[in-house]
């Protein structure tokens, strides 16, 4: 199969960008950054600087006037700060969800996660004659338990056996396992946890899915600021969220979910994300509006 692109050295990559109209003040530094960050990773940041066909909307291999490699790097560095901040912010949310699930399911039974009889209707659902939802989840949980090298897991197994109470077991569950366990939980548990978050159970479940996708982007170094997010979470009637309902498919809307959870659950002062947004490089080619942030963004849920 023929390759669609020819190999180009870093020097040739710089020259290609220059011939297409991207200003590069320091070619040597540009080569160094291309070598350490990769041409196609950076291309996501200069893509909005390209000219587009008037009617078809197809991107041309020509840059807009004023486009520069330096701005590309500034946008990348902003996005890098944003990824790190998002990952840290979601870490707090994940820990809170773990604790709430462990506590509320533990109130039902210490081993509720192991016995479908203690769970809700969704746990019993099955497709055709295959395993039910809980059995599939339980297989993943047991695999995680076997693979864990955590000292507390080894200690607990030696002293008590492999059946860990839910408030211990949640510590080896990743976000996906926690989300599915929340979905399988009995309504009383789902509602208690959702109430603490100021949401209904279906709303919180949709938030957990959205935030898990965002966490995966952050963990895998994916571009965040200039992306369309496919899953739109269900919102409550909180006025702070109503004002951002129209941008839930952009990063600003997704960031608002993190901020809301931090405020609602008292996880932090919620200042880090607004501080990072304030570092967005000021320019006319790729404005902050690309994130979905309105002009009055600082008065919305991100800072309230």
List each model region and its residues.
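Long, contiguous internal "core" modules enriched in hydrophobic/ aromatic residues
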Residues: 1-304
